[in-house]
């Protein structure tokens, strides 16, 4: 019995060392993220149940081709819960064809040209005395800051959103999930 346990322990140890030495990932979450990196921002968002409202909005605004483009883009992606915080009827109203221009402005306010992972955002905040002004594709800016260990985004109206998930890789950029929809001026 002792020999069997020792053999099993050696096998597990050897397998772990071999996998580590060959740089093979045994982390299913990490592997899944690497798989998704083959997909564009829209593909990654569409495969995540937390972004169904965002994906519907991107389709309604005819931004799928843009966000499937080469990029790179950084998207501060509002979750379904973030859209749920908006006043009742707001999402329904924004999705109407006659409000496409407004919807496009709101969505592109969440997109930044270039790829900024969480580490780069934090570094920029620290390098700029605690506030990093980010110009969005929409044209207005967001201000990134750190409070209580969380990265926050402040829009031009003074609304604040917290980054709740970072560094979701896509083939043409990166997604950071946020808990509140930010609004342009």
Q: Residue spans of the language-model regions?
A:
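Mature, structured domains of secreted/extracytosolic soluble proteins
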Residues: 5-6, 20-185
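N-terminal secretory signal peptides that target proteins for export/translocation
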Residues: 1-3
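Bacterial N-terminal signal peptides
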Residues: 9-18
């Amino acid at each position: 019995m002792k020999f069997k346990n020792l053999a099993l322990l050696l096998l597990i140890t050897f397998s772990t060392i071999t996998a580590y030495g060959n740089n093979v990932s045994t982390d299913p979450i990490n592997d899944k993220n690497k798989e998704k990196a083959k997909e564009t921002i829209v593909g990654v968002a569409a495969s995540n149940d937390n972004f169904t409202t965002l994906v519907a909005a991107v389709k309604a605004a005819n931004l799928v081709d843009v966000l499937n483009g080469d990029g790179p883009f950084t998207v501060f992606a509002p979750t379904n819960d973030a859209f749920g915080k908006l006043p009742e009827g707001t999402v329904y109203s924004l999705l109407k064809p006659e409000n496409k221009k407004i919807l496009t402005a709101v969505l592109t306010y969440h997109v930044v040209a270039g790829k900024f992972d969480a580490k780069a955002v934090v570094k920029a905040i620290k390098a700029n005395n605690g506030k990093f002004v980010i110009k969005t594709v929409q044209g207005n800016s967001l201000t990134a800051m750190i409070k209580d260990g969380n990265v926050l985004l402040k829009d031009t109206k003074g609304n604040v959103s917290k980054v709740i998930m970072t560094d979701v890789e896509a083939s043409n950029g990166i997604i950071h999930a946020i808990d509140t929809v930010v609004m342009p001026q």
